Design a protein with these regions (language model features):
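Ubiquitin-like/PB1-type beta-grasp interaction modules and other compact soluble beta-rich domains
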Residues: 1-65
Length: 66
């Protein structure tokens, strides 16, 4: 299945939902913000949010600093 991740085409055959997509990128979930088709998601929604052909995902990796 092809989707857009941060504006670039991505083949995500193994990911059925947002949680599996994030797992595939090996990002710590507590440090990631996700938007799915223009809707910001809470982490508890990731497993419930199925991916479909053509979806748009924005992933923001939050880094602490000062």
């Amino acid at each position: 299945m092809r989707i857009l991740v941060n504006g670039e085409g991505a083949d995500v055959r193994g990911a059925q939902n947002v949680a599996e997509l994030i797992d595939g990128y090996r990002m710590p979930p507590q440090a990631v913000l996700v938007e799915h088709n223009g809707v910001a998601l809470h982490r508890r929604e990731w497993r419930e949010r199925a991916l479909a052909e053509g979806d748009r995902i924005e992933i923001i990796h939050v880094v602490a600093g000062g």
